[in-house]
Amino acid sequence: MTASPVRVYYSKVCKCYIAALSRAAENTGDFIMSFFEKLFGSFSDKELKRINPLKDKVLALEPEMQKLTDEQLQAKTTEFKARLEKGETLDDLLPEAFAVCREADWRVLGMKPYPVQIIGGIVLHRACIAEMQTGEGKTLVATMPVYLNALTGKGVHVVTVNDYLARRDSEWMGKVYRFLGLTVGLVVHGVEANDRKAAYAADVTYGTNNEFGFDYLRDNMVVYKANMVQRGHAYAIVDEVDSILIDEARTPLIISGKGEDSSVMYKRADDFAKTLKKSVIVELDDKVAAEEQVDGDYVVDEKRKTATLTESGVQKAEAFFHVENLADADNMSLRHYIDGAIKARGVMHRDIDYIVKEGEVIIVDEFTGRLMYGRRFNDGLHQAIEAKEGVTVAAESKTLATVTFQNYFRMYDKLAGMTGTASTEADEFSEIYGLNIVSIPTNKPRARKDLPDSVYKTVNGKYNAVIEQVAECHAKGQPVLVGTVSVEKSEALSKLLKKKGIEHNVLNAKQHEREAEIVAQAGKQGAVTIATNMAGRGTDIMLGGNVSYMAKAALRKELSRDLTKDLAQLKDEYEHAKARAKAAGTELPTPPEETIDAQLEHLMTECDGHAETEDAAVLHARQRFEELCEEFEPEIKREAAAVREAGGLFIIGTERHESRRIDNQLRGRAGRQGDPGASRFFLSLEDDLMRIFGGERVQNLMDSLGLEEDVPIENKLITNTIESAQKKLEASNFAIRKQVLQYDDVMNQQREIIYKQRQMVLDGEDISDKLHEMMRQSIDDACTNYLNGETADDWDFAGLRRHFMNWLCLPSDFNYTKDQLEDLTKEGIADELYKRGMDILTAKEKKYGSKTMRELERICLLRNVDSKWMDHIDNMDQLKQGMGLRGYGQHDPVVEYRIEGFAMFDEMIASIREDAVHMLLTIEIRQQNAEPKREQIAKPTGEGAPTQAGTKGAAPVRVTKIGRNDPCPCGSGLKWKKCTCKEYHPDL
């Protein structure tokens, strides 16, 4: 019997009602939080109320500051420093210091911070995150807290996400600090060690997060204190703080050296992975049950992004590699290669997670869409992808030093940050970094309209709607920015727009060279720009276009014409000079084309720069640039008015990101400084986020309503479902980052102990007593180990003799009569060995002198600390790799890692103790008149390698006796302590 229309309608309403109740239950926690914030006010609201009176004090001082001459204003810096020395605090100085800096901003830059920017500056001084919308002038905001905190003389670090911004801001804002009598330094890629040291010694240091972190690691690898560049971590302001402290939190900084070449095994593992059948599931809830259900050799869990062999896959692996049991400990390395191969083929996708360019696999940043040159996936995944793509498989690397951004930035006494999107990650900022977020009001009311999501059943339906929306906006002259999540999808949309005959620019990881130009001109009338997330931040999109880029384009043509007008004459001169150089056998001159190109690029870089210069060509280029800006200004204003009339910039999102924050960044490109604009997300049930996280509920709703693929649904229920999925994923990613931190906290505690011990050596402290204690402890440990029987008859004298052979023992030692055994004690034997050691050291001091002995002591301890620590890093990494399976045994992997990790650390400390003492007792100097020099144990390879420490041609040191961990000279391949040959072990 056919149901009546009323019954059908009632059924649909019930389904919607039930779904709404379900969603309401999920959002109860958010509702309660929102209720209490409305009732009592959020932290941000309360903080703004506390800050407003301070802001008013700063503004009230403006007339007083305006009356001061430049010299009087500059003298305030000296006055403030003197007041700090007399006991005043930075908080006491804040109103005056901010007012002084604000006036300096105006006199030097022609910009005066607005009241809301003063609020932002106070928030930064209070070690919070200032959440400021796009176009609100974060760069200028930072000048006030930077100036105030630099007065302490401890140094302020301003951290940016790339070299360009660090250089630009150090030159631009640096003018203000220099005007006020402060020094400014810059730390970017390529800066030499001596210049880095000077940069860190400055009052204000600009640099990237990577450079600050790597310099910290390099400082803890140097062998002389003079080679260290950083001087402490007092105060840092992190620009785009969410990008650095959240998005980059799972990526450790690693300085590595050359490791083993395992390319053959990676290729074999990939050959095996090609033969396997893949099975994809949304979520692997029950591993065992899932493996029984799936029809494949390995399972790809889309939600967790993992790949796991099934029982069928294990059997095939054992047959392919001719092993009996893949789970055996002996096959752990093989399992590592196989796991990497199936993850490379099942989880990692070309043109989404990475691209292949000129025979190299380059990572695509999932948050920005930019190429991450120099970065590599860890745990051998990068090599597995290289094998999959058929490019050269690079050798594995050995980790020499490592730290996460989480633990690096938690070292600062005071930390603050700026971003346009932080609120969605408030819990993480608070829990991990102790940072609260204050939302700064905009200077002008926001006029952007955020339209409801349009959800379609299929991707085709969604793309058709996107093209229609773009065509509609384009027809009326409204600029459009279309955001995509991958290279692949941006190119698919580009093809559809070409078919429609709509001119557009594409900006993705493959076509990033014109990024700044494309994004800056994305606000021109009728412009259409398709971009991955790389357009989400960092460059302002100005309505009507960017006058600076128009002026630069015109200036490039003029300069190119001027520089090449005498090219023919220059070529003739070059040919004559080249002939003379060949005849004389001297170096050939540079071709004029190369010289002209280099000069052109230099002038184009400097034409809008801020660095002080006396170069006439640069000064002329800057003057002409300003003139061209004035010429283009009226045209830009007319076009901007037309764009505003058309509705401003229209933002189209074609897919929701895993994080709401990234979506908000895309929306934030429109509506800067009160400009009109709009945003809308076009989604489909086939999108990854919808398909994996809760799309079934929406699918059922759309099916029940009988909607076709090109008919959208715009409903709050849909939006709530999507946001709920994003919140779940954000919580999941937070949990992962938190676990990364928990693991790294174990390493961090150990790292602090090791680095503190290194620093003690570098500082030149007298470590003689420390080494004497280490010798006593090593002797006591050995005696406890070998002399552990109840009576002397049960003691292992042969073992003790082997242990100390050739440094504290001779083959004739510990041969006792029965009567002598009765009088022996462990303490007596230990005392005798310790006395021998002290006698050896006393003789060495007499032979070499106290100065040389102190240096030898430092060499021995430093070499052993460094070499053992590097091995320990690898061992801890291997331990962590095996921790995942502990969860199946009802054990907390982090707790197990901490317990076993510190047991390994204790073993390493004992090894450092014994080997350092052994080296000190046996070391000899070849050249009596030469002072011993320290040498770096391991040297990094590739980019970011630290400058080699020490002195070239230093007098070498040598160990005259065989070390316990040295290879036995008999050629067995065993360490001396484990070899049983008679020739080199006469006591056996």
Regions found by a protein language model. Give the residues of each.
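Acidic, low-complexity intrinsically disordered tails
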Residues: 12-13, 21-30, 569, 573-617, ...
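Short, Lys/Glu-rich amphipathic helical modules
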Residues: 477-490, 763-764, 791, 818, ...
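Short hydrophobic transmembrane-like helices used for membrane targeting/insertion
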Residues: 1, 6-8, 13, 18, ...
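Hydrophobic, well-ordered secondary-structure elements that form the walls
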Residues: 482, 530, 869, 905, ...
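Conserved P-loop NTPase motor core
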Residues: 21, 29-684, 688-701, 756, ...
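Glycine-centered loop/turn positions within well-structured domains
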Residues: 251, 480, 537, 869, ...
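Extended, charged helical/alpha-beta scaffold domains that provide interaction surfaces
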Residues: 354-362, 368-376, 610, 643-644, ...
